[in-house]
Amino acid sequence: MPEAGGRRLHEVARINLSVEPVNRWRMKPRLRRASPLSHHLIEAIAQTLEARPDIDPARVGVVGAFFFGCLEYSVRFYKGLSTDGRRFASPILFPETVVNTPLSHVVAELGIGGPVYSQVGDTSCWVSALRTACLWIENGDVDHVIVAGAEEFEPHLLDAFHALRWFTADHPFRIAEGAGAVLIGKKTPNAIAEITRIADGYTFRTRDQARIAGLECLGEFDMNAPVMNTATSWAAQKAASLLSNRQLVSLSQGPQHDGFTASSAWNTILAARQRHYPRLIVPHWGLSQNIAAVEISRTAENTAGAG
Protein backbone atom coordinates (compact mmCIF):
# COMPACT_ATOMS: atom_id res chain seq x y z
CA MET A 1 0.00 0.00 0.00
CA PRO A 2 1.22 3.57 -0.54
CA GLU A 3 2.57 5.33 2.55
CA ALA A 4 3.38 9.01 2.93
CA GLY A 5 6.82 10.26 3.83
CA GLY A 6 6.59 14.03 4.05
CA ARG A 7 4.98 14.91 0.69
CA ARG A 8 6.15 11.72 -1.00
CA LEU A 9 4.35 8.42 -1.53
CA HIS A 10 6.13 5.08 -1.42
CA GLU A 11 5.07 1.50 -1.86
CA VAL A 12 5.15 -0.45 1.41
CA ALA A 13 4.19 -4.10 1.90
CA ARG A 14 2.46 -4.33 5.28
CA ILE A 15 0.93 -7.14 7.34
CA ASN A 16 -2.72 -7.10 8.33
CA LEU A 17 -2.68 -8.24 11.96
CA SER A 18 -6.44 -8.83 11.96
CA VAL A 19 -6.41 -11.80 9.57
CA GLU A 20 -5.42 -15.43 10.02
CA PRO A 21 -3.01 -16.82 10.99
CA VAL A 22 -1.41 -13.76 12.59
CA ASN A 23 -4.54 -12.79 14.52
CA ARG A 24 -4.40 -15.92 16.67
CA TRP A 25 -2.06 -14.05 19.02
CA ARG A 26 -4.02 -10.82 19.43
CA MET A 27 -6.08 -11.95 22.43
CA LYS A 28 -3.26 -13.63 24.32
CA PRO A 29 -2.96 -11.66 27.60
CA ARG A 30 0.76 -11.05 27.19
CA LEU A 31 0.40 -9.90 23.59
CA ARG A 32 -2.70 -7.69 23.71
CA ARG A 33 -0.62 -4.52 23.98
CA ALA A 34 2.53 -5.88 22.38
CA SER A 35 4.16 -4.20 19.39
CA PRO A 36 3.42 -5.31 15.83
CA LEU A 37 6.99 -6.59 15.78
CA SER A 38 6.12 -9.07 18.53
CA HIS A 39 3.19 -10.38 16.50
CA HIS A 40 5.27 -10.76 13.34
CA LEU A 41 7.97 -12.53 15.30
CA ILE A 42 5.82 -14.97 17.26
CA GLU A 43 3.99 -16.16 14.15
CA ALA A 44 7.26 -16.90 12.33
CA ILE A 45 8.77 -18.71 15.31
CA ALA A 46 5.56 -20.61 16.08
CA GLN A 47 5.41 -21.90 12.50
CA THR A 48 9.02 -23.06 12.84
CA LEU A 49 8.22 -25.04 15.99
CA GLU A 50 4.99 -26.43 14.56
CA ALA A 51 6.94 -27.84 11.61
CA ARG A 52 9.07 -29.89 14.03
CA PRO A 53 6.82 -31.18 16.84
CA ASP A 54 9.45 -33.81 17.67
CA ILE A 55 11.98 -31.36 19.17
CA ASP A 56 12.11 -30.36 22.84
CA PRO A 57 11.39 -26.61 23.31
CA ALA A 58 13.40 -26.71 26.54
CA ARG A 59 16.51 -27.40 24.44
CA VAL A 60 15.81 -24.72 21.85
CA GLY A 61 17.52 -21.32 21.84
CA VAL A 62 16.42 -18.22 19.96
CA VAL A 63 18.52 -15.52 18.32
CA GLY A 64 16.69 -12.49 16.95
CA ALA A 65 18.11 -10.11 14.35
CA PHE A 66 16.67 -6.59 14.20
CA PHE A 67 17.48 -3.38 12.39
CA PHE A 68 14.86 -0.95 13.69
CA GLY A 69 13.19 -2.71 16.61
CA CYS A 70 9.85 -1.63 18.08
CA LEU A 71 9.27 1.51 16.05
CA GLU A 72 5.58 2.11 16.64
CA TYR A 73 5.80 2.20 20.42
CA SER A 74 9.09 4.09 20.34
CA VAL A 75 7.52 6.85 18.24
CA ARG A 76 4.46 7.01 20.49
CA PHE A 77 6.59 7.14 23.63
CA TYR A 78 8.98 9.84 22.45
CA LYS A 79 6.17 11.83 20.88
CA GLY A 80 4.45 11.94 24.26
CA LEU A 81 7.73 12.87 25.91
CA SER A 82 8.53 15.68 23.48
CA THR A 83 5.04 17.17 23.09
CA ASP A 84 3.42 16.68 26.50
CA GLY A 85 6.41 16.60 28.83
CA ARG A 86 8.15 13.94 30.86
CA ARG A 87 5.26 13.28 33.20
CA PHE A 88 3.12 12.25 30.22
CA ALA A 89 5.64 9.72 28.87
CA SER A 90 3.65 6.56 29.53
CA PRO A 91 5.47 3.89 31.56
CA ILE A 92 3.14 1.37 29.93
CA LEU A 93 4.66 2.12 26.53
CA PHE A 94 8.32 2.21 27.52
CA PRO A 95 8.90 -1.55 28.02
CA GLU A 96 7.60 -2.17 24.50
CA THR A 97 10.31 0.09 23.07
CA VAL A 98 13.10 -2.22 24.28
CA VAL A 99 14.49 -4.28 21.42
CA ASN A 100 14.61 -7.56 23.37
CA THR A 101 10.98 -7.31 24.54
CA PRO A 102 9.45 -9.08 21.51
CA LEU A 103 11.67 -12.11 22.04
CA SER A 104 10.77 -12.12 25.73
CA HIS A 105 7.09 -12.28 24.78
CA VAL A 106 7.72 -15.05 22.26
CA VAL A 107 9.69 -17.44 24.45
CA ALA A 108 7.29 -16.97 27.36
CA GLU A 109 4.22 -17.63 25.22
CA LEU A 110 5.70 -20.60 23.35
CA GLY A 111 7.48 -22.20 26.31
CA ILE A 112 10.97 -22.05 24.82
CA GLY A 113 13.56 -22.83 27.49
CA GLY A 114 16.96 -22.22 25.89
CA PRO A 115 19.07 -19.06 25.77
CA VAL A 116 17.65 -15.97 24.09
CA TYR A 117 19.68 -13.24 22.43
CA SER A 118 18.96 -10.19 20.29
CA GLN A 119 21.42 -8.87 17.71
CA VAL A 120 20.89 -5.33 16.47
CA GLY A 121 22.39 -3.91 13.32
CA ASP A 122 21.65 -3.44 9.67
CA THR A 123 20.65 -6.33 7.42
CA SER A 124 24.06 -7.94 7.84
CA CYS A 125 23.43 -8.68 11.53
CA TRP A 126 21.38 -11.66 10.34
CA VAL A 127 24.66 -13.38 9.49
CA SER A 128 26.06 -12.65 12.96
CA ALA A 129 22.88 -14.19 14.37
CA LEU A 130 23.49 -17.33 12.31
CA ARG A 131 27.06 -17.49 13.58
CA THR A 132 25.86 -17.17 17.18
CA ALA A 133 23.39 -20.00 16.64
CA CYS A 134 26.08 -22.25 15.19
CA LEU A 135 28.36 -21.56 18.17
CA TRP A 136 25.62 -22.43 20.66
CA ILE A 137 25.07 -25.77 18.93
CA GLU A 138 28.80 -26.46 18.62
CA ASN A 139 29.26 -25.75 22.34
CA GLY A 140 26.38 -28.05 23.27
CA ASP A 141 24.35 -25.27 24.88
CA VAL A 142 21.22 -26.33 22.98
CA ASP A 143 20.09 -28.93 20.47
CA HIS A 144 18.43 -26.46 18.10
CA VAL A 145 18.38 -22.70 17.59
CA ILE A 146 15.68 -20.67 15.90
CA VAL A 147 17.17 -17.65 14.16
CA ALA A 148 14.55 -15.04 13.36
CA GLY A 149 14.62 -11.70 11.58
CA ALA A 150 11.74 -9.29 12.03
CA GLU A 151 10.89 -5.67 11.27
CA GLU A 152 7.85 -3.44 11.65
CA PHE A 153 7.03 -0.38 9.57
CA GLU A 154 6.38 3.12 10.89
CA PRO A 155 5.97 6.12 8.51
CA HIS A 156 8.86 8.05 10.09
CA LEU A 157 11.14 5.52 8.41
CA LEU A 158 10.40 7.10 5.04
CA ASP A 159 11.66 10.50 6.14
CA ALA A 160 14.77 8.89 7.60
CA PHE A 161 15.47 6.99 4.39
CA HIS A 162 15.11 10.16 2.34
CA ALA A 163 17.57 11.91 4.63
CA LEU A 164 19.99 9.01 4.16
CA ARG A 165 19.48 9.09 0.37
CA TRP A 166 18.39 5.45 0.30
CA PHE A 167 15.64 6.17 -2.22
CA THR A 168 17.40 6.32 -5.57
CA ALA A 169 16.07 6.97 -9.06
CA ASP A 170 18.01 4.04 -10.52
CA HIS A 171 16.91 1.46 -7.95
CA PRO A 172 13.37 1.79 -6.57
CA PHE A 173 13.38 1.02 -2.86
CA ARG A 174 10.25 -0.87 -1.83
CA ILE A 175 9.87 -1.45 1.89
CA ALA A 176 8.26 -4.38 3.66
CA GLU A 177 7.56 -5.48 7.21
CA GLY A 178 7.24 -8.98 8.59
CA ALA A 179 9.35 -11.81 9.95
CA GLY A 180 11.02 -15.02 8.95
CA ALA A 181 12.72 -17.78 10.91
CA VAL A 182 14.93 -20.80 10.31
CA LEU A 183 15.67 -23.78 12.54
CA ILE A 184 19.32 -24.71 12.89
CA GLY A 185 20.57 -27.95 14.42
CA LYS A 186 23.33 -30.50 14.10
CA LYS A 187 23.80 -32.07 10.69
CA THR A 188 21.19 -34.77 10.09
CA PRO A 189 20.08 -36.76 7.02
CA ASN A 190 16.72 -34.97 6.87
CA ALA A 191 18.18 -31.45 6.82
CA ILE A 192 17.29 -29.64 3.60
CA ALA A 193 20.53 -27.63 3.52
CA GLU A 194 23.58 -26.70 5.55
CA ILE A 195 25.60 -23.58 6.24
CA THR A 196 29.05 -24.27 4.84
CA ARG A 197 30.69 -20.87 5.22
CA ILE A 198 30.04 -17.60 7.03
CA ALA A 199 31.78 -14.28 6.37
CA ASP A 200 30.79 -11.30 8.50
CA GLY A 201 32.21 -8.18 10.09
CA TYR A 202 33.15 -6.32 6.89
CA THR A 203 32.45 -2.79 8.01
CA PHE A 204 32.24 0.49 6.13
CA ARG A 205 31.51 4.16 6.81
CA THR A 206 31.07 5.46 3.27
CA ARG A 207 29.62 3.99 0.11
CA ASP A 208 33.06 3.80 -1.46
CA GLN A 209 34.23 1.83 1.56
CA ALA A 210 31.17 -0.40 1.16
CA ARG A 211 32.42 -1.51 -2.24
CA ILE A 212 35.76 -2.50 -0.73
CA ALA A 213 34.02 -4.29 2.14
CA GLY A 214 31.87 -6.19 -0.33
CA LEU A 215 34.90 -7.16 -2.39
CA GLU A 216 36.69 -8.49 0.70
CA CYS A 217 33.62 -10.31 1.97
CA LEU A 218 32.82 -12.07 -1.31
CA GLY A 219 36.51 -12.87 -1.72
CA GLU A 220 36.07 -15.41 1.09
CA PHE A 221 34.02 -17.60 -1.26
CA ASP A 222 34.69 -19.64 -4.38
CA MET A 223 34.56 -17.38 -7.44
CA ASN A 224 32.71 -20.09 -9.37
CA ALA A 225 29.84 -20.38 -6.89
CA PRO A 226 26.59 -18.64 -7.91
CA VAL A 227 25.56 -15.57 -5.92
CA MET A 228 21.99 -14.71 -4.96
CA ASN A 229 20.76 -11.29 -6.04
CA THR A 230 19.76 -9.60 -2.77
CA ALA A 231 21.00 -5.99 -2.96
CA THR A 232 18.57 -3.06 -2.72
CA SER A 233 18.76 0.74 -2.76
CA TRP A 234 22.22 2.18 -3.42
CA ALA A 235 23.86 -1.17 -2.66
CA ALA A 236 22.35 -2.61 -5.85
CA GLN A 237 24.69 -0.53 -8.01
CA LYS A 238 27.72 -1.54 -5.92
CA ALA A 239 26.69 -5.18 -6.08
CA ALA A 240 26.19 -5.08 -9.85
CA SER A 241 29.74 -3.80 -10.26
CA LEU A 242 31.23 -6.37 -7.89
CA LEU A 243 29.33 -9.31 -9.35
CA SER A 244 29.71 -8.52 -13.06
CA ASN A 245 31.97 -11.55 -13.56
CA ARG A 246 29.99 -13.96 -11.38
CA GLN A 247 26.80 -15.94 -11.88
CA LEU A 248 23.99 -13.88 -10.36
CA VAL A 249 20.84 -15.75 -9.35
CA SER A 250 17.40 -14.22 -8.70
CA LEU A 251 15.05 -16.48 -6.73
CA SER A 252 12.29 -14.07 -5.68
CA GLN A 253 9.37 -13.43 -8.00
CA GLY A 254 7.85 -10.02 -8.71
CA PRO A 255 9.08 -6.68 -7.33
CA GLN A 256 11.72 -7.08 -4.65
CA HIS A 257 10.81 -5.50 -1.33
CA ASP A 258 13.31 -4.89 1.45
CA GLY A 259 12.20 -6.11 4.85
CA PHE A 260 15.77 -5.78 6.12
CA THR A 261 16.46 -8.61 8.60
CA ALA A 262 13.10 -10.18 7.70
CA SER A 263 14.24 -10.23 4.07
CA SER A 264 17.49 -11.80 5.21
CA ALA A 265 15.47 -14.63 6.73
CA TRP A 266 13.30 -14.99 3.62
CA ASN A 267 16.34 -15.05 1.33
CA THR A 268 17.95 -17.72 3.49
CA ILE A 269 14.81 -19.85 3.23
CA LEU A 270 14.69 -19.39 -0.54
CA ALA A 271 18.34 -20.41 -0.84
CA ALA A 272 17.82 -23.49 1.32
CA ARG A 273 14.71 -24.62 -0.56
CA GLN A 274 15.87 -24.03 -4.15
CA ARG A 275 16.80 -27.15 -6.10
CA HIS A 276 18.85 -25.80 -9.00
CA TYR A 277 22.23 -25.14 -7.39
CA PRO A 278 24.24 -27.44 -5.09
CA ARG A 279 25.51 -24.35 -3.28
CA LEU A 280 24.60 -20.71 -3.27
CA ILE A 281 26.23 -17.64 -1.77
CA VAL A 282 23.72 -15.32 -0.10
CA PRO A 283 25.10 -11.80 0.51
CA HIS A 284 23.46 -9.51 3.06
CA TRP A 285 24.15 -5.94 1.99
CA GLY A 286 23.83 -3.74 5.02
CA LEU A 287 23.04 -0.15 4.10
CA SER A 288 24.62 1.52 7.11
CA GLN A 289 27.31 -0.62 8.77
CA ASN A 290 28.40 -4.00 7.43
CA ILE A 291 28.37 -6.45 4.58
CA ALA A 292 28.21 -10.17 5.27
CA ALA A 293 27.47 -13.38 3.38
CA VAL A 294 26.63 -17.04 3.89
CA GLU A 295 27.22 -20.06 1.70
CA ILE A 296 24.29 -22.47 1.81
CA SER A 297 24.73 -25.94 0.36
CA ARG A 298 22.02 -28.39 -0.48
CA THR A 299 22.42 -31.81 1.10
CA ALA A 300 23.24 -34.62 -1.33
CA GLU A 301 19.78 -36.17 -0.96
CA ASN A 302 17.97 -32.93 -1.68
CA THR A 303 20.24 -31.92 -4.55
CA ALA A 304 19.72 -35.17 -6.43
CA GLY A 305 17.44 -34.68 -9.38
CA ALA A 306 17.74 -30.91 -9.37
CA GLY A 307 17.26 -29.42 -12.80
Question: Predicted regions: what is each one?
Answer:
Residues 143, 149-154, 159-164:
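Glycine-rich anion/phosphate-binding loop at the beta-strand->alpha-helix junction
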Residues 41-46, 51, 102, 109-110, ...:
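Active-site-proximal alpha-helical scaffold in enzymes
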Residues 1-20, 159-229, 277-279, 285-307:
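Condensing-enzyme catalytic core mediating Claisen C-C bond formation in acyl metabolism
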Residues 70-73, 125-129, 153-157, 204-205:
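Short, well-ordered, mixed-charge alpha-helical segments that flank or form enzyme active sites
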Residues 65-67, 97, 110, 148-151, ...:
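Fold-independent oxyanion-binding glycine-rich loops
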Residues 25-43, 91-95, 116-128, 169-180, ...:
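Active-site pocket-shaping loop/turn-to-helix segments
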Residues 4-110, 114, 217-248:
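Conserved beta-ketoacyl condensing-enzyme motif
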Residues 51-65, 77-91, 112-115, 138-146, ...:
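Structural signature of cysteine-dependent C-C bond-forming condensing enzymes
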